[in-house]
Design a protein with these regions (language model features):
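PRPP-associated nucleotide enzymes
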Residues: 1-114, 118-194
């Protein structure tokens, strides 16, 4: 079993790979949803996934790992633990990411940005902008799963444990809406598992 298959198997075992008609946080619609919190509830899966992600950056001399709230907190902590460095997280406030709770980033600090699922890159770009404000040295970006099929690009190296192309649709051009498949906002209703 290759790494991608192993990662997707973890998502399936934890019942995190869902099928239906979903409203994503980006506002797009999709027929597949990865419910990250179904994976994050199992420490043994988080440990495996984050160890693998940390290994992709172990030669980079990372000094701090930063993740966006909410799932990114767990990912940043576990990756930092594996890299034997510190972790902090960026919270959303007023349409942008900020550091609270006394978190600081030092100028030039070698920074790894991590998150759980990459769809449009919105949360990661907000963290990139925050790290730039602090003049941190962004070494790379790591995600558990890139559901954009590699379409989302950053100015920094991106490493994903698995890349899948999950179709997304604009709400006004969604075939699932045309077929009158009920739209579900994840976390709000029981849905079918793959």
């Amino acid at each position: 079993m290759d790494e991608k298959e192993e990662i997707l198997e973890i998502f399936k075992k934890s019942k995190a790979l869902l099928s239906g008609h979903f409203l994503l946080s980006s506002g797009l619609h999709s027929d597949i949803y990865f419910e990250k919190f179904q994976v994050l509830q199992y420490p043994e899966y988080v440990q495996i996934l984050c160890k693998r992600l940390a290994e992709k950056f172990e030669k980079e001399k990372i000094e701090v790992v930063v993740g966006p709230t909410t799932g990114g907190i767990v990912i940043a902590y576990e990756v930092a633990k594996n890299l034997k460095t510190r972790s902090i997280f960026a919270e959303s406030e007023g349409g942008k990411r900020i550091f609270k709770r006394g978190f600081q980033l030092n100028e030039g600090e070698r920074t790894l940005i991590v998150d759980d699922i990459l769809t449009t890159g919105g949360s990661i770009n907000e963290v990139v902008n925050l790290v730039k404000e602090y003049k941190g040295n962004i070494i790379g970006i790591g995600v558990l799963l890139d559901r954009s099929g590699g379409k989302v690009k950053f100015d920094y190296p991106l490493k994903a444990l698995a890349t899948v192309e999950a179709k997304t649709y604009e709400p006004d051009n969604c075939p699932l809406c045309e077929e009158k498949v009920p739209l579900v906002k994840p976390g709000s209703k029981k849905i079918d598992l793959l």
